[in-house]
Amino acid sequence: MKYDVVIIGSGLGGLICARQLAQQGRSVVVIERQRQPGGCLQSFRRDGFHFDTGLHYVGGLGKGQTLHDAFETLGLLELPWQRLDADGFDQITIGRQTFPLAEGYDRFVDTLSGYFPQEREALNKFVELLLHLPPMQESIQVSAYDYLTSLFHAPLLVNIVSATAMKMELRRESLPLFTFVYSLSSYVQSSWRLKGSGNLIVHSLIKDIKAAGGEICCNAEVVQLQESNGRIAAARCTDGKSFEGRLFISDVHPQVTLGWLTDSKALNGTYRRRITALENTMGMFTISLVLKANTLPYFNHNKYVYRKANVWTFTEDVGGIGGVMISARVPEDGSTYVRQIDLMTPMSWTLCQHFTDTMVGRRGQIYELQKERMADECIQLAEGVIPGLRAMVETRYTSTPLTWRDYTLSPFGSAFGIRKDCRNPLMTMLSPKTPIPNLFLTGQNLALHGIEGVTKTAFNTIESLEFSV
C-alpha cells in the first residue's frame, strides 16, 4: 500500500501530525521503532507503578491561554488535568531561602516584589516581555543571560527567574531570549499536572488516529529512506519491510534522519554539513522514587533546589550535584499522600562516554555505582526541602542520557534537542522543510522544545506540508 503520509517516530509531534492529517482524510501510517509508542511522553511500569519519562507539567491550558486552543482541537483538554498552586506553582530554593513563582503576571510581580521591592519596575518590564512575546527575529539574536543581568540589579533575582532550568539548558553565552521567554511564559499563565501518566495523551491521540483510519506500526525501525527521481519513495525497516508514501514526516532527530539518507542524490552537501555540525543540549539524570505509604503529603507544586546562587553555571561545578527539580505525581486514589516523585538534574555526556557501546541493563558495575552515587547526592540535596526523604524511599529507579539515547535516538541523550544559539540563530533554528521536496521535519529540534514548542511545531509542519502540496 502507498500511503499519503508516512510519519517516522511516534513522539508528540509525530502523533499530532498523524491525528490532524488522518482527520483530513489522508491515509497515514506512523512508524515506531520501540514496542510502545509515545516517545518522551510514554511511561514505563515497574512493580505496579507507572513512571513518566519526559512529561511533568504543562503551562497555558486555561481559556484564552497559549495552549488552550491547540489542546482543545486535539481533544486533550478532556484529560484529567490538575491545576498547580496559584500562590506558587514552582517553589525555588537557593541555599536556605525559598521563593515562590506565582501564577498570573500581576501576582508573579507582586510576589517577587515582596522580596525585592527595589526591582518592581524591572519585574513589570520582565512580565511585559512574557505577556507580549517578542517576535522571533528580534529575540532570537539576544542573549537571555545578558538581558536578565542588564534588567535586574539583584543577582539573586536573576537566579530566581532562571531557576526552572530543568525545562531548558541554561548557557550564558548562547541561550536566546526567545527560547527563555517561551519556556517560561505559559507556566506563569497557569501550570497543570496530569492525574495519570503521559500515556493518557498518547492513547488519546492514537485513538483519534485510528478512528480516522490511520495506522500505528511499532517494532518498525527505519534504516533507510529510499529515493526515486529526487523524492523519498519509501522508508525501509530493519526487517526488510518498506512503507511507501507520497509525503514523509520525520519526528526523529534531524541528524539521525540524515543518517537514513547516506546515498542521497537529492540532499545537497551544504544542508548535510549544517545539520551534522549542530550541537545538542545536555541530557538529564532522573531518579524515580516510590515512597512508603503515608510518609509524604502530596505537594501541588514543583520544587527547584540549588545548593547556591549559581543557577546558570551549577552544571559546571565539580563538587557534586548542584541543583535538582522535584516533581510529585498526583495521587490517583484520592489520597492526601504522594507515592511517587521524580528528581531530575542535568547530566553531562562526559559522564556517559565510557559506556557508549553498552546496552540498557548491561552497562557494568562502574556505571551502576556512578548512578547510585548521583542518586544519593540528589536525594541529599532534596532533603533540604523534604527532610527525611531518604528514609521514606521504598524503591528507586534511575535513568541517564544513555537511556534517552537508546530509547529515543536523541544524540548524546539530549533532553531538549538541538542547542539554539543567539550568536548564530539562522544555523540553529530549523524549518520543517528540507531540500527534498516531500520530506518534512517536526519535533523539538526545529524551533522550540517542550510540550508547547512541539505542539506548535507540529501544526507548523502540517501547514508547510499543505503549502508544499
Regions found by a protein language model. Give the residues of each.
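A glycine-rich dinucleotide-binding beta-alpha-beta segment and adjacent secondary-structure elements
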Residues: 154, 158-168, 384-448
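A conserved FAD-binding loop/helix module that cradles the flavin
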Residues: 55, 444-466
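Helical element adjacent to the flavin cofactor pocket in flavoenzyme catalytic cores
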Residues: 181-232
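N-terminal glycine-rich phosphate/pyrophosphate-binding loop and immediately adjacent elements
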Residues: 1-122
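Mid-domain catalytic core of redox enzymes
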Residues: 223-336
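Rossmann-like flavin
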Residues: 94-176
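C-terminal segments that line or cap access tunnels to active or ligand-binding sites in enzymes
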Residues: 292-399
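Feature captures the FAD/FMN-dependent oxidoreductase FAD-binding
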Residues: 91-109, 134-137, 210-211, 215-216, ...
